[in-house]
């Protein structure tokens, strides 16, 4: 298994249930967050701390992970070199358990591979029956000409990550990567788009300025990679969208 995100770790755990040996290759360190903290979903715990300043919230989150998991080195995994929040954490309850029980074997970055034979950067070589790459997604819109829209290698100049500054009837729904769940945000974006289509919501006149403001002032400062161009703070983005919708048009949050 190549990758350290949610999909890679989930697939590594699942394949380890039926395979004789499963290895997972990370090219950098990731923070692994449990799905449940203190008996509650980790995103709910994060939401309950949202009234705190971001730096303090990140510090407490980092300390909580260290207390619950210990250091990555204890599991043979690379330690994260970035600050908390600069990259997306991985949410998984079983990976560290499987590593400790010898079901998943951590490996470093890959130097090269020839067929099913993989040579790692530490000089070790292993042969695998199946190699699965979960190395992320490219932001792509193949149905558009590249000179029209191509956000694969650049920042995304869209107001609320959905409105183009020139084309009023073009909407991007769900093209954001929150530090939290994407579905409630996508729902609100869809509702806002519906109101724009029916004329119940009017685009701001300074939308070009607002698009550039989102690019220059992102919610979260992260490392400069194509993956991190659409990151939003879940709670802040939720508030921004809700302000533009009638109160009776917004779904109520479930109580946990």
Segments from the language model and where they lie:
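Short, hinge-like loop/turn segments at secondary-structure boundaries
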Residues: 39-45, 49
């Amino acid at each position: 298994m190549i990758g350290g995100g949610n999909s890679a770790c989930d697939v590594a755990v699942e394949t380890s249930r039926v395979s004789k040996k499963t290895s997972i290759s990370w090219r950098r360190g990731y923070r692994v967050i449990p799905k449940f903290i203190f008996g509650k979903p980790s995103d709910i715990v994060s939401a309950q701390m949202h009234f705190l300043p971001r730096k303090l919230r990140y510090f407490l989150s980092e300390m909580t992970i260290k207390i619950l998991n210990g250091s990555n080195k204890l599991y043979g995994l690379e330690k994260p070199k970035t600050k908390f929040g600069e990259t997306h954490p991985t949410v998984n309850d079983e990976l560290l358990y499987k590593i400790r029980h010898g079901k998943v074997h951590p490996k470093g970055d890959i130097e090269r591979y020839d067929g099913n034979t993989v040579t790692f950067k530490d000089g070790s070589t292993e042969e695998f029956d199946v190699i699965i790459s979960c190395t992320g997604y490219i932001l792509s819109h193949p149905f558009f000409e590249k000179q029209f829209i191509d956000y694969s290698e650049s920042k995304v100049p869209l107001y609320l990550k959905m409105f183009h500054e020139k084309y009023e009837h073009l909407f991007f729904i769900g093209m954001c990567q929150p530090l939290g769940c994407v579905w409630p945000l996508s729902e609100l974006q869809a509702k806002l788009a519906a109101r724009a289509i029916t004329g119940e919501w009017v685009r701001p006149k300074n939308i070009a300025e607002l698009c550039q403001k989102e690019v220059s002032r992102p919610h979260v400062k992260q490392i400069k990679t194509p993956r991190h161009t659409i990151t939003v703070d879940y709670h802040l983005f939720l508030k921004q969208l809700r302000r533009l919708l009638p109160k009776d048009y917004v779904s109520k949050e479930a109580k946990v």
